[in-house]
Amino acid sequence: MQNQLIRLTYASTATFKTDIKGGIESEVARILLQSRRNNSRIAVGGVLHYGDGYFFQCLEGDESAVKSTLQRISQDQRHRDVQILLNVQIQRRLFEDWSMKYST
């Protein structure tokens, strides 16, 4: 049985210093690579924005998968002060084809 689909957005503070190379911060590039690999396995999608030392992310998918993803993010040393901004049930996804889109 599949859980309910949800959309969850959060904001957090980055704990690393900005080091931009090739148009994207190197630590953010590592986060994106890991997120895309992990999210495609568990059918979680969304979009990540990073700017001025802050993350804003929207995650969509099966409720248990999204919540376990948020738990991993909350325990990730690169994030602090994780604040949930939205957590709602949805009928369909906006980001179904994006394992993790990046926005600047």
Model-derived segments and their meaning:
Residues 1-104:
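Charge-rich, low-complexity N-terminal segments
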